[in-house]
């Protein structure tokens, strides 16, 4: 992944710290059962990620009897879209967010007198929390759809706070990425695209509701 970042930056003639990334220190296991428990926990999280479409399917089968026929047809499309966004979030997190976060936290130091020694548990926790967190963020268009249906969100509201959302995204990107603009842009663009898609989704819902009146 770091080599890919390096190659991308080189294409645009930009210098990058990713071209010479080294992690000489090894992760530490501080208890007898630590490696086993982390292996089990990682397997559970991986199983949850892989089984996400099946969990959605089972949830849909539970609520589908209470839906109208046309609603059942549309909800099948939501199963696909929700699963697609979830796995897109997993891939983006695993190949972009996690490597950048690891690089940042590994090299961050307040003073030279403090040495960073990372445990296996902290690493696994950071990776799993990031994977699940980013995957949930990628469900933003689906969330906006339902909030608009309930009348809690409008397209105009999302447009008004677009600049605020951009500032928040850039601040978060600046925190978890190395101090270069290119890295921040790589992280920010997909999230802002999701925000723009959410505006379109909200507008679509409002227009459809107006036609049905």
Where are these regions (language model features)?
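Membrane topogenic/interface segments and analogous intrinsically disordered interaction regions
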Residues: 1-213
